[in-house]
């Protein structure tokens, strides 16, 4: 083959290569245009572009914020320890079991930090013990009933220990975190629960709240019927500033419920997933002033929060899968539960399957053995 024939052959090959390259560029541009169109089209809210934006941290409050290793500390599990200060405080031991399950147990331990809100006045040795157990401690003041409610009003507290439970509201002040899963000490973790943090924020308000579906209440010395309505002037901020928000919880339920349980009007506050917010804390305190609006606070913070995040209002609570908080556990519930809720340290309690008593005491024994063998 002479020189000119070779030159013509190479020229043809080069032209073909350029044609292929140009074709690829055109196809890529068409794909990009299609992607942009999908992103703009409200019929495709979960587009690849918007998902990528979350993945790469462009939306720092988006539901994928925890995918980044550097962001793990922005989410946390959180317990609560209040008074009394006695060596035989069963709730102290229960808090230790909770921390052990979330920090060290091979089947349930979390990749997220574990904090404990500790009310000022708790014995220092208990605080130090929780630190050695692996918890990070946040000291908080007691939120007293008299500091919240209007002078002259009273509450129908169901238990002496309930007097400290408004202190749990301090979780809304922990704005160093984006999401907090706060758990009562009598929750026994049975399976890993890290995916609870995948629960998305609520970014938009309802079109219009169904105020007529709110519970009816009466004011003291007044026989008129009233229903709750948010007063944003009293809160000192427009409604739009309260978004995004998050209060996720499981349906409250009664003994003998079906499995899975039916949806309820109210949630159980033994486990909540919240987006801490000073504005929401201020709003909650304003609502708390009038306990006659929320059943005289018979269930303390649970009664209050069920009004503040009523499903018919501007800030409806987010329903979590029932498996995260097994209330009034039945035998049928057990295979599904990630956490069971009850005083399982009580040997003679027949309100729940006895295997949970064995599980709790097994976990307590494991934590004692674990820390005996760990150099502190």
Curated annotation (Swiss-Prot):
Annotated GO biological process: protein N-linked glycosylation; protein O-linked glycosylation
Subcellular location(s) per record: Cytoplasm; Nucleus; Membrane
Protein name stated in the entry: Uncharacterized protein C4C3.09
Principal localisation: cytoplasm
Gene Ontology CC terms: cytoplasm; cytosol; Golgi apparatus; membrane; nucleus
Gene3D superfamilies for this protein: Spore Coat Polysaccharide Biosynthesis Protein SpsA, Chain A
GO molecular function terms attached to this record: alpha-1,3-galactosyltransferase activity; glycosyltransferase activity
Membrane-spanning residues: 19-39
Top-level division of the source organism's lineage: Eukaryota
Keywords attached to this entry: Cytoplasm, Membrane, Nucleus, Transmembrane, Transmembrane helix
Membrane topology: Single-pass membrane protein
SUPFAM superfamilies: Nucleotide-diphospho-sugar transferases
Record-stated family: To S.pombe SpAC5H10.12c.
């Amino acid at each position: 083959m002479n020189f000119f024939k070779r030159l013509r052959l190479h020229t043809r090959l080069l032209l073909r290569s350029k044609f292929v390259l140009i074709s690829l560029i055109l196809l890529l541009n068409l794909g990009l245009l299609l992607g942009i169109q999908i992103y703009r089209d409200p019929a495709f809210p979960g587009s690849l572009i918007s998902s990528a934006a979350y993945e790469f941290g462009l939306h720092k409050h988006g539901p994928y914020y925890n995918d980044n290793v550097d962001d793990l500390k922005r989410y946390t599990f959180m317990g609560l320890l209040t008074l009394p200060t006695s060596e035989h405080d069963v709730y102290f031991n229960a808090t230790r079991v909770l921390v052990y399950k979330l920090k060290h147990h091979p089947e349930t331990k979390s990749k997220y930090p574990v904090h404990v809100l500790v009310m000022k006045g708790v014995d220092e040795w208990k605080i130090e013990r929780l630190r050695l157990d692996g918890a990070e401690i946040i000291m908080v003041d007691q939120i007293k009933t008299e500091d919240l409610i209007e002078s002259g009003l009273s509450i129908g507290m169901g238990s002496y220990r309930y007097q400290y439970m408004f202190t749990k509201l301090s979780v809304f002040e922990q704005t160093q975190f984006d999401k907090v899963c706060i758990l009562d000490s009598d929750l026994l973790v049975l399976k890993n629960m890290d995916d609870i943090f995948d629960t998305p924020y609520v970014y938009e308000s309802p079109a219009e709240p169904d105020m007529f579906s709110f519970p009816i209440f009466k004011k003291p010395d007044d026989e008129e019927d009233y229903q709750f309505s948010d007063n944003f002037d009293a809160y000192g901020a427009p409604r739009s500033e309260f978004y995004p928000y998050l209060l996720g919880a499981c349906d409250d339920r009664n003994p003998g419920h079906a499995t899975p349980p039916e949806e309820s009007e109210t949630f159980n506050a033994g486990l909540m997933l919240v987006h801490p917010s000073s504005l929401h804390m201020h709003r909650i305190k304003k609502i708390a002033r009038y306990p006659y609006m929320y059943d005289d606070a018979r269930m303390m913070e649970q009664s209050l929060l069920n009004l503040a995040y009523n499903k018919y209002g501007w800030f409806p609570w987010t329903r979590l899968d029932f498996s995260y908080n097994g209330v009034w556990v039945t035998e049928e519930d057990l295979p599904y539960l990630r956490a069971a809720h009850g005083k399982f340290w009580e040997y003679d309690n027949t309100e729940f399957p006895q295997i949970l008593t064995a599980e709790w005491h097994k976990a307590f024994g494991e934590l004692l053995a674990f820390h005996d063998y760990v150099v502190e």
